[in-house]
Amino acid sequence: MWMIFSGLIVGGLLGFVMQRTRFCLTGGFRDMYVQKNNKMFYALLIAITIQSIGLLILTATDILQIPAHSFPILGTIIGSFIFGIGIVLAGGCATGTWYRAGEGLIGSWIALVLYAVTAAITKTGILKPVMDKINQPTNVNSDMSQTTGIPFWGLVVILTIITIFLVVRTLNNKKVRVAVPKLKQRYTGIRYYLFEKRYHPFIAAIVIGLIALLAWPMSASTGRNDGLGITTPSANLVHFLITGETKFIDWGVFLVLGIFIGSYIAARVSREFKWRLPDKITIRNSAIGGICMGFGASVAGGCSIGNGLVETATMTWQGWIALASMIVGVWTMSHFIFVRPMKKVHQQSAKVKQQTQIV
């Protein structure tokens, strides 16, 4: 009962907060390249930093132990790159797909189902030999503290200093802001703050970092010594639905179900829930994106949450290499979907303008 309750609570909080704050790593990584806007990436660093400080305290007081492990460096790079491509096509990362499904987006449902099914096939099905072939000969020590000689607390201090510097610089950057007309306020009191008010990404990141930290002791109390994770629980849910075997049900499964429920509640009460049927191109992209996400995250040993938020906070090479690789994947696909079409439009506009001047 505790496993069900704690998993749903943590997942519900995460889904609720992400839906209400529109916390989207896919959009953040894309904007770094397309719009030269790093704000969401810095928000991710805030969440990682908060979690890492909390883990430092929990491990120093022997409340929690983070076991060292090796990781497949080639698989992490290749898998994360493919995952990055997939999340652009799908319009959201693993967590983003779960919470957008809770908003009624059919495209996210398509991506979510294929993501979970592909992850299951890759981890235990016909694609497992492919994953093993990529990963087998490339295992190296993932512990940054052991490989660099810098203690865990030292790495946390370095990350904290870098994050504070970037956040302060961003907040002090006085850019000219375009006045955006505000909609009439619908709610008052706590309902306004929970279901209407929009929050700065940095505020959202603080809350998400605390939720990510809370996930560790909650998960450990059920025998799962890990933090937030999306891919394996999603695959386990598929296995359970197919086989009916309860061995696939653990804290992580209730976590992802909680994300969906929390997002649904937030979208319903804030009147943002709506069944939305995408066009044919979006359906195609969502399907391909979901498949890439499931395969890539399985090969890499984690998604934008498992690797990008959790493994980075534990100061592992797997986390930081995966994060860099998935960002490159996002940039690569963003170039073909957003940047190149925009360049063509600008070139055509310039050509028309030139012809007009000649006439």
Residue map of PLM features:
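Membrane-interfacial helix-loop segments of redox and metal-homeostasis proteins
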Residues: M1-V359
